[in-house]
């Protein structure tokens, strides 16, 4: 089944929690050959090291988290830090939903900062995630289909006024020494036709 969560790049991270009082805490680390977000490389096609943590309440469905990665836009900034919070749950009929807010921050170049609110709904292996940009930030609509429990998935997105993208991903079903591995192929068609991209990404990740 598709479970909506904060998405910044193809991390393909499995879920593993440890209990801390009434909250669940998850730490994650990942190494990738590229950081691709909505079909566009955020590192100039160079490798990315990322990590973060989530604190969530299994009883109430609320969560809050921080995630960061290196970036390269050919400017002063080289770091992205994201802060997010939301509420996620699943109905008795198996319909899951996720509502939240995310702030994308670039400490060395604050003019790049932006914010979104998002709503995701999924049933079995099909889902849609709608992100509403704040203060003139473009909106984004993303459809995802997981092919059963095979680990194979397809995502199609429309980033309003920026471009459209497709991602085909495969998450290997077995971990090795607690490390997960995933691969993906992405295609981005820019709205003006001048910034099209094709990408391949592989990611090693681990949760604690």
Language model segments and positions:
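Outer-membrane beta-barrel proteins
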Residues: 2-7, 17-208
